[in-house]
């Protein structure tokens, strides 16, 4: 009887134990390379902030290692930054912004004006890691801090 109770208890535990799901990351569609975009929306207290300009720099290329996509620094900055441990880091964005003169400006993105709706659009982008820097602030506002964003992620 004791063995039977232990067996029933073990079966109940296995049935109640939640299954573990493993999800693979979505593989970027190579056909979209060169056809991606970044839209930056400037809003303060729920209202669009127009004016000012943004510049976009490509700081990383997408590469694959052990089946995982990652960002590797562009050639212009490989001597200063060998890898991107945390591509979402504010500190990394600040460091890259301080190296702005070395960074390749994205074609047609050296000075994109922020429109009346508070948006700036960077289009026809290749896969990679990008640094967004505000060159001029909207009248009455300060510049936003530089930030990093990945395409297509």
Regions found by a protein language model. Give the residues of each.
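Solvent-exposed loop/turn and edge beta-strand elements of beta-rich ligand-binding domains
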Residues: 1-153
């Amino acid at each position: 009887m004791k063995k039977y109770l232990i067996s029933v208890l073990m079966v109940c535990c296995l049935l109640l134990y939640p299954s573990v799901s493993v999800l693979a990351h979505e593989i970027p569609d190579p056909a979209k390379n060169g056809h991606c975009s970044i839209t930056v929306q400037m809003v303060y207290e729920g209202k669009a902030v127009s004016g000012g300009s943004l510049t976009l720099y490509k700081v990383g290329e997408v590469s694959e290692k052990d089946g995982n996509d990652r960002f590797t620094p562009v050639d212009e900055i490989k001597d200063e930054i060998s890898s991107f441990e945390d591509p979402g880091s504010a500190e990394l964005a600040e460091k890259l912004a301080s190296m702005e003169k070395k960074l390749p400006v994205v074609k047609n993105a050296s000075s994109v004006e922020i429109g009346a709706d508070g948006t700036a659009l960077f289009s026809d982008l290749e896969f990679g890691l990008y640094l967004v820097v505000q060159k001029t602030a909207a009248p009455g506002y300060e510049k936003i801090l530089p930030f990093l964003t990945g395409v297509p992620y």
